Amino acid sequence: MHSSPTSTRKQASFAASASAQPRKSISFINPSKSSAGKGYAASNPNKLAVSRTMGFLTDMKPAEKLNVPSAKTVQVLDSKGVDVTPRPLYHPDPHAASAKPNKLLTSQEGSLGSDYISSYSLYQNTLNPSMLGQYTRSVLGSSSVSKSSISTTESMSEDLEDSSYKRDRLASFTDVRVLRSTAEAAISKEELEKTIEIILTETETLRFFDLPTVMFSTESEEAEKIIEKNKKYETLCRNRLGNDLYVERMMQTFNGAPKNKEVQCEKIILEEKGVVATTWDLYDSYNIPETLLAAKRSGYSSKGSLPAKDRDPKIQDSESSSLMDIENVILAKVQEDEEDNSEAILKSDKLHQDLFYMERVLMENVFQPKLAAYRQLPVYKEHEPEEPEETLQVENLKVAEDEPKKEDEEEVEMELELEIATEQSTIPANLERLWSFSCDLTKGLNVSSLSWNKANPDLLAVGYGNFGFREQKKGMACCWSIKNPMWPERIYQSSYGVTSVDFSNSSPNLLAVGYHNGTVAIYNVQSSHNIPVLDSSESPQKHLGPVWQVQWIEQDRGTTGDDKREILVSISADGRISKWIIRKGLDCHDLMRLKRTTATGGKKGGEKEKKGEALISRQAPGMCFAFHPKDTNIYLAGTEEGLIHKCSCSYNEQYLETYRGHKGPVYKVTWNPFCPDVFLSCSADWGVMIWHQDTVKPFLSFYPTTYVVYDVSWSPKSAYIFAAANENRVEIWDLQISTLDPLIVNVANPGIKFTTVLFAKETDCLLVGDSDGQVAVYELRNMPTASDTSRGDVINILLGPKTNHTG
């Protein structure tokens, strides 16, 4: 291959400075396209480490340069014409879009014109651009071309610039930039649905303020060291006093910088008060003691053995001063003794006992007529005071004159008394109020339960507590005595309402109390302390609902019936009937768990079949119970469903019988004391029913009012008299006289509700509790009496023969 003219000119122009090494020439088959006018010269990125002498086509005209086709091939020939063109190390993608040539290796100072491109020096970096892919564009942009360094040994013309190499170079740099700035691949749906585990770890604790404690527990590990250290310090302080080993000296310490802080508080109200004491006030205050002392001194001086004239005035003055001192000491001593004695007297038990008896005597004097009527005794009349003899003589003369008149008056009085007696015999039965057990502590509380003491008929236990859950207040149980109706003998206050009370039979000093929170407590009334002897507050088997009734029951231990033991039975709203045995605390066992029952019986004609209601709880809340008076193994239980179940202590899984009749909660069930097969019940459905234990339906039903009946009670003296407490009145029924209307009706005051009734044991009196905290005592007057022989047969006559009851 022949050498181009360019090579000839290149050899001729650089002949003087050429070296002995062989020359290389570059031939362009396709000249460069349009590189003129650009102010930079491009270097071949495929050549490394050395600079070669290149010639520029400076003789070509701009017009000829414009005619050079764009495609070109670069060949490097040595002096012998051998092609030594180096192969490119980087092969760009032909399909990749060529970006605009960026001036990566150009000077940052500006661009050169075409007139100054003919000769300048290019300092090429000895680094392959393909190796710069790891660096950023700032590194690539740091290469620059100096306009001022023009070399004659190595020059290049813009016309000889290889455009293909330039394009390759720009593409390579573009690829490098694209690889660095490529965005992350899009996340697919499968990757989004994958579960990613994120582990949260605790960061380091940042302490903004740490105040070390100066107190340590005696049970801590450091307690022994601290105690030993404190002892050493104490011994050091003791040995320091008077010891020559210790010297006091001054030392400067750093005090903490004070900090002012503002705190918001309530307004401080200031008040000014002044007291003025005049000289006359002071004189009057001290004048009275001085006059008393002067009077006493005069008394002492009058008892002297020597007259005042014979004595020395100095001796008199000394004696008077000594006497004053002695008197002051004696008076002070007397006052101290009086104060000490007064405190001891007020706190003595003997004084309290004397005051207790004195109070009872005064109450009996005040309530003597009422107490006599309660005990059915004659009323004591006070004696008239005796008159002097003169007045008696005058009166005797008058009496002698008025005797005929008095006889006539006595006859008239006798006739009036007979008329009154006949009128009283025709007066119907009624209630006369005697007194009421009430005080300031019971004012406004609801009377929930009444119970007589079995050993002392004059002692009454009263429970105070509301029935409703939202009406709960503080409760109280009191023991009242008939000898003092104004104040209770014992007071047991609690945070919960009292729902039931009952005295023990074998131990009359024990009082059982049931509370609204499910606690059962036992108090000893012989003790003045208000702390219960036993309670179930911490028992794991305590009731979960209000304890509506508690009662002491004597049960047979053996088959003979002589050996009996007493247990405490309670019924609660949680559906449990439990017995409590006093051994080591309160030992609880369930007699029965009341379960809800579904209604039985076919539907009547024209009645639609009712759908079964979903049961919220399987347990039926219990409201009351009553043990059989003859067989204590059998008892009745009234529920909130309106059913009465007959149960046995030997079977705790099923009922012996179920009595249906009430439509509301059964509040009270009680056996007839003279006819043990008949019992009485009252309910919130306004009704009172009489049942026979062999028949599941009631024999008699009483609906006199449209009010709730809270309590019923049989009379202890008659088999057919009972009392019922409605909301607004108390009714006394006599089944022998009428089964339609009550015998006596006593209406309550406005705003007051009757809650409990209880007959007195030994008298014809009735106790009625109300919602205002009063227990009124009424005397039953003109009540009909039944013959003793027919007591147990009247109920059977009213209900029919027993053979007809079965079935």
Curated annotation (Swiss-Prot):
One of its GO terms (biological process) is cilium movement. Residues 32-43 have a biased composition (Low complexity). Residues 1-11, 22-31 have a biased composition (Polar residues). SMART domains: WD40 (SM00320). The keyword Ribosomal protein does not apply. It is found in: Cytoplasm, Cytoskeleton, Flagellum axoneme; Cytoplasm, Cytoskeleton, Cilium axoneme; Dynein axonemal particle. Its main location: cytoplasm. Residues 308-317 have a biased composition (Basic and acidic residues). The keyword Cytoplasm applies. Part of the multisubunit axonemal dynein complex formed at least of two heavy chains and a number of intermediate and light chains. Associated with axonemal dynein subunits such as, DNAH2, DNAI3, and DYNLT1. Interacts with DYNLT1. This is Dynein axonemal intermediate chain 4. It comes from Mus musculus.
